[in-house]
Amino acid sequence: MKRFILLAAIIFMGTTFINAQELGLNIGNKAPELIGKGPNGETIKLSDLQGKVVLIDFWAAWCGPCRRENPTVVANYKKYKDAKFTVGKGFTVFGVSLDDSPERWKAAIEQDELEWPNHICDFQKWNSKFRMIYQVRGIPDNYLIDENGVIIAKKLRGPALDAALHKYLREEL
């Protein structure tokens, strides 16, 4: 009986591990389209950025770790926005907020100086359709995509973002 329970536990854990690895999007997957409303009510589409290297950045104004990560994202945006990459021309950020307050969202964009023009939010917090499409389970979270919308890296925090962008540079800055 003990062997049966042990065998069942091993099979269950193995199945759970395999299923956990299959969740979310992986490197090599095409990034799903995102279409949302920007801070001024304008429609913003991820596909409009085709040709560039894009960081799809999931965050929220109420998220302390996200706000602490924002200076790193801003520094990399400023450093690489006009760079030439082997996988695209230029770099930008596509900010996807999991906020529920338009006022707090807009204030955080301004306070953290998130100067890229691509910000969307559906104000559904954890029920956000954007979070569900990308199967985001925690924030901050991100995906780096190439000029064709293919995921080339993910979960880039701190110096890992700069290292990933530098890896794809066509020429030194």
What are these regions (language model features)?
Residues 37, 106-143:
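Short, internal strand/loop/helix patches
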Residues 51, 58-75:
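Conserved redox-active cysteine motifs that mediate thiol-disulfide chemistry
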Residues 53-54, 91, 140:
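Alpha/beta-hydrolase fold active-site loops
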Residues 68-95:
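Conserved helix-turn-beta segment immediately C-terminal to the redox Cys motif
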Residues 85-103, 116-125:
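Thiol-based oxidoreductase modules, predominantly thioredoxin-like and allied folds used
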